[in-house]
Amino acid sequence: MTIHSPWETSHSKKGLIDIGTHRLFARVSGPRRKPGDPVILIECGGGSISLLWTGVMRALSPTYRIFTYSRAGLEGSDLPPNRGPRTAVEMADDFEKLLDVAGIKSPYIIVGHSYAGVQIRTWMHVHDRMEDIVGAVFVDTATEYTYPRMPIREPQFWFLMEQIPNPAHVLGYDRVHKFFNKEQWEEVLSTDLGHEEKDVDASAAQLKTWKQFERQIMEDKPVSVIKGYFAEDLRRLCVEAERIGAGTPAQRQYVMENLDSLDRVFEETETEQLRLSSCARMVHAAPGSGHTIVFSDPEIVMNEIKWVVEQYEAKRSIATIKGDLSNITAPPFLLASQSTCEFPSYWAEHPSIFVAPALEPDPKKRALLVLRWFLAALKRQQYAGRDEKEGVKKPLNAFLGELFFAQWQDQSGTTKLVSEQVSHHPPITACYLWNDEHGVRADGFACQSITFSGTVNIKQMGHAILHIDKYDEDYLIPLPNVKVQGLLTGTPYPELVGSYQIACSSGFVADIDFSGKKLFGMSGTKNMLHAALYSADDKQRENPIYTIEGAWNDKFTIRDESTGENVETYDTAANPATILEVAPLDLQDPWESRKAWGETISSLNGGKMQGASDAKSKVEQGQRAMRKQDEQNGSKWEPVFFSNEPRDERYIRLTAVAGTSTEEHSQSGFWKFDKDRAERARKPYHGSLRPDNVES
């Protein structure tokens, strides 16, 4: 992409652009683009101007390049040569000429508000821009079906705008916006919007003939639809109109009686936009935010723009990846803001469920409660504590010697965790989880092998052994394999795969089967599980004691097979995680996760991708230098809290109960919590040495 235009090279620019027949006022801001980087094109709503988007532009422009303009007759743009109502096709022609004259090259991410929903899709079709557009955000947009279905049209509510002295004040738009300083906001209030005439019905009718919803015109490109509340704006104006006597009682009553129907029309027609792409999602603005979301709920607009950019960038990266992912460094936008060293914490987020087996005298029910704990922890483990709608991201690769300490406090007392990265090749995380009040403890270790073949395949090696002091009872806890599906369609989600056993030293085995969403949806359902608890003597698995059916990311039901009754339906949404407690950063050791990755995490959370990349590289380069020094000196890294043993009798006994192989650990050995090492451990754990190989 060779760039010559000042509209592409200037960090910030505004002014009139002559498109031949008239001039249009435009704005651009943001860093210069590299080849393949998208520019965000903002098409304003009906009668709206580019100035109203400058707050969002200012907040996003440190990271993204953004171009917007005001259509003919608005904000200093010339009136069009042909006066009178204009169609979306005529406006699309103006936009196409504008991009050409300004030298704004693809790829484009298009953002439209309100009437711009009709406008930008007309431009896509008329000027054959589908290949150039890599994503879209529709901000409370109208479609070709909105206007014909609306129970209230402009002639029926326009009295509100004409007779109320300051409708912007009633709607709250004249309050200083968080992304504007006072001076900038005064410019917004003092600027003449201008005027444009639109032939809405003709434009909608034309768009309808192209049947874009039926053809999924954006294929698998990311599309976000943000639903606002236009009806709420009209309600507020009606209340004010009644207060000051604007309009007739009949006019006000008609509007008020049809507001619910109006909102349903917007909900239905905006939802239809999800059919434009197989990679589409819909989010709702904050209740009461009204129609002009760029003022009332700007964060949601910014977040959805970021989401679309991230999905596009992810596709660019994924297209170049094949084979083993273990040593591939993910780009920052794909990274989660926590390390793999933190992941054992998700086993402990429900302390009461973790210790519940210690309170149960019946061994069968104890085994069931251990199975319940295992299943209840899966959702937040697989999504790394993120909202399910946000999908999955790659965690930071823990460095050798990385440490993570945490605790949880609730009615069950205090549950604690220590985890440590004990090996680099292969990467192994060891952990120890315990609750002294109830005498429940678990230690384990995990090593992941990650490959890519359209889906990310994560094979987990390792296990945990849960011990209950009161009954001197052990349980072998498996680590399920994972496929991350949907990467190429932009909606990544984890799917557990395979069959596993939880073996109990008291003579019980739980069989667990994860049946994922099969190809083309012909069989199976996403995130489903089936589990059954048996006596270990029931070798043919003919007489289950308890069975469990459901979805590990939603609800699952436990059934007592002896009575045929459902014992419990566990709802993941109704059981929020207990708050995780960690030491303040200034009290953490340099080798603790959040201290060591502090700059990286801060940059990721702040959307500063370059800063995240630089901070991450600093740690990684320091680690490479340390490994090279170890190799030259013939030294071996020694963990602080764990030691490796060639044999674990507990594991051998429990695999015999389950009837599974012991070959998995023949090479790597068994990592176990070492009480002697733990008692000797003192801060600073590695003296003056830091993870970035710089002495403190």
Swiss-Prot record:
Gene3D superfamilies: 1.10.287.2720, 2.40.160.120, 3.30.70.3490, alpha/beta hydrolase (3.40.50.1820). GO terms for cellular component: cytosol; membrane. InterPro entries: AB_hydrolase_1 (IPR000073), AB_hydrolase_fold (IPR029058), OSBP_sf (IPR037239), Oxysterol-bd (IPR000648), Oxysterol-bd_CS (IPR018494). Residues 615-633 have a biased composition (Basic and acidic residues). Residues 603-642 are annotated as: Disordered. Keywords: Transport. The keyword Transport applies. Belongs to the OSBP family. The keyword Transport applies. Pfam families: Abhydrolase_1, Oxysterol_BP. This is Probable transporter efuK. GO terms for molecular function: oxysterol binding. PANTHER family: OXYSTEROL BINDING PROTEIN, OXYSTEROL-BINDING PROTEIN-RELATED. It comes from Hormonema carpetanum. Probable transporter; part of the gene cluster that mediates the biosynthesis of enfumafungin, a glycosylated fernene-type triterpenoid with potent antifungal activity, mediated by its interaction with beta-1,3-glucan synthase and the fungal cell wall. Might be involved in transport of enfumafungin to and across organelle membranes.
